[in-house]
């Protein structure tokens, strides 16, 4: 089954979503992705971003976009790890799988009543941070979370970490989109419409079950 998702569809919920719904959406997106992949969704940030963006767009009628680029991961106690593909790799890669180090997440721009434009950021992969730390041989003492959901202007690098070598190249940013990476991510999305459509449908069914069971 293919699900075609556009931002003009009649919304089911208002965006930005109430914070009380965040863990519910996180759970159904994770279950959908993990059931369709291996290792509980580990190393599948692209799938989380694409399925999550399509699902949120379907729910709200607002355009949520999967984006890809670099990330500085915070493992706690000042242990930071940089995920970033080299410029040469970004220029020569013809498929997302050819990017050695990258991260994917979701963004949406919202215009508030006072005219302010803010960027909402959603990342359903924080549940795997401790596993990443173990894989690269670094200790993990950070906060155990399953997702990040908020605003870019509220998710800033603390002053005490801004001089860390991890931020030397891109400045004090936890995540930064890269055009080439995002283009490859969107190509991957177009390449497998039925695959992602099934996961979005699964997430919608899981959400309906949640509402029915707890309504």
Language-model regions, residue ranges each:
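A structural boundary/capping signal
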Residues: 1-215
